[in-house]
Amino acid sequence: MLIIETLPLLRQQIRRLRMEGKRVALVPTMGNLHDGHMKLVDEAKARADVVVVSIFVNPMQFDRPEDLARYPRTLQEDCEKLNKRKVDLVFAPSVKEIYPNGTETHTYVDVPGLSTMLEGASRPGHFRGVSTIVSKLFNLVQPDIACFGEKDFQQLALIRKMVADMGFDIEIVGVPIMRAKDGLALSSRNGYLTAEQCQIAPGLYKVLSSIADKLQAGERDLDEIIAIAGQELNEKGFRADDIQIRDADTLLEVSETSKRAVILVAAWLGDARLIDNKIVELA
């Protein structure tokens, strides 16, 4: 497994792979890898000849400096996991390598609408940072496919739109959420939880599933469903942050013509902001 930290060396390897006619898959990550990331890697391996995993804690997508400072950097452990998975290439650049003149004056990519709605409304600049680094990685790696987790539902929708709008010839693969046996979605943020909070955390998925059951049963008073769900989260020990029920295909409000709904839930548990989602077919 090659570990590359600089742009010139990465370009050299990508040119070689292209000359050999290899089909390349990219799995962009910020490191602190868990089994959910490994599921992305496995999907990439099944679809391509060569798998490139990027590990880069992107400062442009953090709206709070304290979150950037405390994000775990576990490069050695991450590379050991990826080597066992027989990943071909790890791209682990420094911030200076990606943003040589800092982030303030760096050219950015913005996806109108999707960048500022829902999750983007409470995290200004976050999705602009995501779309900028992902587009840069696409230009550098030139993958045939790229794999992203469906847990970050809005992020996946944003990347799909960016790829369509910018004409990237890349297949975007959404990989289903990987969950623990108790239903908790695997996430790097789970590492912030105390032992006691780990016992509470699965309650998020229980509330999410309760909302889904109501929608499938034909309930359509969305305001009431959301209000009850928020109350249930707070009673379980969370601080409900945002609960949305949207059209799964547009992320706009559910209408009479909506065929699928996506339930988006965000809640604080201690210092960890947990997110989850579930898609429901509407009768």
UniProtKB/Swiss-Prot annotation:
Amino acids binding ATP: 30-37, 149-152, 186-189
GO cellular component: cytosol
EC number(s) reported in the record: 6.3.2.1
UniProt-annotated location(s): Cytoplasm
Keyword hit for NADP: no
Keywords tagged on the record: ATP-binding, Cytoplasm, Ligase, Nucleotide-binding, Pantothenate biosynthesis
MF annotations from Gene Ontology: ATP binding; pantoate-beta-alanine ligase activity
Active-site feature positions: 37 (proton donor)
GO biological process: pantothenate biosynthetic process
Main localization, broad class: cytoplasm
Binding annotation for beta-alanine: 61
Pathway membership: Cofactor biosynthesis; (R)-pantothenate biosynthesis; (R)-pantothenate from (R)-pantoate and beta-alanine: step 1/1
Domain of life from the UniProt record: Bacteria
Catalysed reaction equations from the record: (R)-pantoate + beta-alanine + ATP = (R)-pantothenate + AMP + diphosphate + H(+)
Keyword ATP-binding attached: yes
Stored Gene3D superfamilies: HUPs, Pantoate-beta-alanine ligase, C-terminal domain
Binding site for (R)-pantoate: 61, 155
Assembly: Homodimer.
Family: Belongs to the pantothenate synthetase family.
Function: Catalyzes the condensation of pantoate with beta-alanine in an ATP-dependent reaction via a pantoyl-adenylate intermediate.
General remark: The reaction proceeds by a bi uni uni bi ping pong mechanism.
Identification of the protein by name: Pantothenate synthetase
Annotated source species: Shigella dysenteriae serotype 1 (strain Sd197)
Gene: panC
